């Protein structure tokens, strides 16, 4: 009798949970339609892989790219709709979240064609690679719209788990295994630190998990200036710092960049920063509204350390990927300036604008590195000497992307940094802006050093890798070159589209 009662209660409880989930999906599912497209794409990939042979490989790329493009289209159609909170407060859709989701989808869309030839040459498993990329993209999109502490913790873990698997995808490479181990251990430690900070925030607010309700809870409990909030701020800053990889939370970055497959590095170098920046902006701006002076100070220290250490250490690197790793640490210092400036002086708009340009500059650079690596098998900066004599198109493309990363006019990086530094100057962050200007000059030095090597014509400086370089045709159907051309154009012709981009970024502010 007791067993029958327990069984009936279990069935009733299960039915209630199922009906509630069905109700949420039915009424709130339209608000995550772009994410649903990616989920449908993932299911299709699994079905095709389990029922087909090697001849259907092009279909896998087609489905992945199509699902990403359709997801971008769905986001664009939803633009300017009223902000909505769905799934019992777990998820929020507004223009601010959607523009970061757009940036993540754009990164993934450009990274897939960048990976095609690399996967074929290295004979890596294709389906799993695409599954991990799409799942990581999905996690990043949910993180951008996360509205409570649980979702903010679970979504980046979805992204991180796929990142660990992607970084160790070349299992036979010792460097890849070492990078994955460091990435996994430090990622696990940072996640535990982050959730510990969330526990302090949860307790101080009286048991609230939604971001806006946490603010109301802190007011009701009069805990908004308590030591517990300061402890929460420190732990959460450290936890988010791992995702953003500013100094001194950058130790994993150079090793992971060097040991991971180059297309994976290209993907992680932009998507992780975009998703973490969106999350950091909302966390600092909403729950820590009453502690703005404290988190401003913390982020200023991180920005200064990142800009100085990242750019100075990049000078000494001999590997292109390690150089770009330290360069990305310096770049995140510039992005943090936009987070500190905030909404009042177009700080968020300048951050979004700079991130859009950073995506094109960084992915364009990595596309050149992937192409050069496949044709020569080397990543050493010294081995790029004389590339212009063998492949002028690739050398010029790499030079333009590097100059744009350095911020030389009239390239995209110059306009992005100009807008970002101008907003910082208007907000009174004079010291930060001066540090940013000085470190930008330092970055131009090591970028120009590489460009000088590219353009050299001295036979004694040209390495055997370039002497034996296989010249590519002027017009090629190579998917890597397609991504490279798109990124180079976006990095070099910003003047026509600068004002509309700024207007869209300003319109996205919450």
UniProtKB/Swiss-Prot annotation:
GO CC, alphabetical: chloroplast thylakoid membrane
Catalytic activity: a plastoquinone + NADH + (n+1) H(+)(in) = a plastoquinol + NAD(+) + n H(+)(out); a plastoquinone + NADPH + (n+1) H(+)(in) = a plastoquinol + NADP(+) + n H(+)(out)
Key words, A-Z: Chloroplast, Membrane, NAD, NADP, Plastid, Plastoquinone, Quinone, Thylakoid, Translocase, Transmembrane, Transmembrane helix, Transport
Enzyme class, spelled out: translocase
TM regions (residue ranges): 24-44, 57-77, 99-119, 124-144, 149-169, 183-203, 227-247, 295-315, 323-343, 354-374, 395-415, 418-438, 484-504
Membrane topology classification: Multi-pass membrane protein
Single biological process term from Gene Ontology: ATP synthesis coupled electron transport
Lineage: superkingdom: Eukaryota
Compartment annotation: Plastid, Chloroplast thylakoid membrane
Role: NDH shuttles electrons from NAD(P)H:plastoquinone, via FMN and iron-sulfur (Fe-S) centers, to quinones in the photosynthetic chain and possibly in a chloroplast respiratory chain. The immediate electron acceptor for the enzyme in this species is believed to be plastoquinone. Couples the redox reaction to proton translocation, and thus conserves the redox energy in a proton gradient.
Membership in a protein family: Belongs to the complex I subunit 2 family.
Name this protein carries in UniProt: NAD(P)H-quinone oxidoreductase subunit 2 A, chloroplastic
Source organism: Solanum tuberosum
